[in-house]
Amino acid sequence: MKTLALLTAAFAALIVGSAAAAIRPPAIRYVDDKFGPVLATPKKQALYYWTAENDFRIHCKGSCAKLWPPLVVRSRAAVPTRVAGIKGTFGTIKRPDGRLQVTFNRRPVYTYVHEAPTQVLCDNVGGWFVVKLR
């Protein structure tokens, strides 16, 4: 069984006109028994980066993106630059289809379609690496 250590983080409210809406983090930290702290979606899907994208551009498209779904958001405002308890910065990059993909330390991040929550199956496979938070 994976040891889960979810960070509790209070996020500032985003003021839109006179209404306030809480910003949900695009990613959390959880502790995997084998890899230690890794970056994951709020549903505990491990997040990966691909070394072919060392130029900070999107290269995983089409069939690649079906196997490695990108973590996307509706707007840049949905992504805080920093998340409590996670060293590094978040941002977004525009995908070729126009959607905004979440980045971590300027690298686009992805899940792996064949993994269940809390699984890490593809670290160091074909240039894909789980985002380790050490």
Please place each PLM-identified region on the residue numbering.
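Positively charged n-region of N-terminal signal peptides that target proteins for export
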Residues: 1-5
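Hydrophobic membrane-targeting alpha-helices
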Residues: 16-20
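Compact beta-sheet-dominated domain cores in extracellular/mature segments
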Residues: 21-134
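Bacterial N-terminal signal peptides
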Residues: 7-15
